[in-house]
């Protein structure tokens, strides 16, 4: 990680003049022990900001929800898997004091590429066979519950396979047993661009997006509702607020990215080969508005970048982000109000 470009005159994130885009570096202010989070653009302690996050696979059917630890995630991916259900991947940087995280479920190969965009340590319990070609080659640091019994435990309040959980001590045991570095790579400069401090992205030319319905996910039918007072979106699914089981609090976020993606079936069993590299269209949603975007990626293991209609990289508002992977043949089932 190219750590700590600090401007003694401003103590702020450096920014580009073109389109106001923010340079994706962490800035450490004089006399403080905080840096800007790569996940949220908000202040976090130096220890948390320098440590690689975890990217945890979470079940999202009625047996797996509500999940635990989701409220602590800076970024959450939702993507379809076989059987019309979705899986979540929660990317968490500050997991030291979360009572439990889970339930942890198995890997699908496209989630590996999303996790790598954040230089995260990938947490999963088993995998679909199509992911083995990447896991067996150790192309991404990962903690597999099938082979690392010290990284997870089984709870007694749910039945298998919906009762695999982890926490700080278990994750650290797994990470240390594998010898993984917990520091960001030297050349990692973050994923998102965030609005410069003291400003916000308002999408004044966007369309109304006070309610975002994702009926493309026909099993859980999730949606988001915007609260203008808090400037956050509240998440719902299964006709009820989507909560974190640890706290009972409803999940919220400042940013929603709809990433439209091509795919082909792997086999008749419904396993999906989601295209994470070729690019496509989408939406960026914040502050009750939405704009059209397009996304690009220079390699399978690279980082996705999102651009507006003027081909300028979008700037997220600091805070939490949901990335919704929408298959191209189901875009028509997404609605904004």
Predicted regions located by residue number:
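Sec-dependent N-terminal signal peptides of Gram-positive bacterial secreted proteins and lipoproteins
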Residues: 2-27
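A surface/extracellular/periplasmic glyco- and lipid-processing/surface-interacting theme
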Residues: 28-77, 82-337
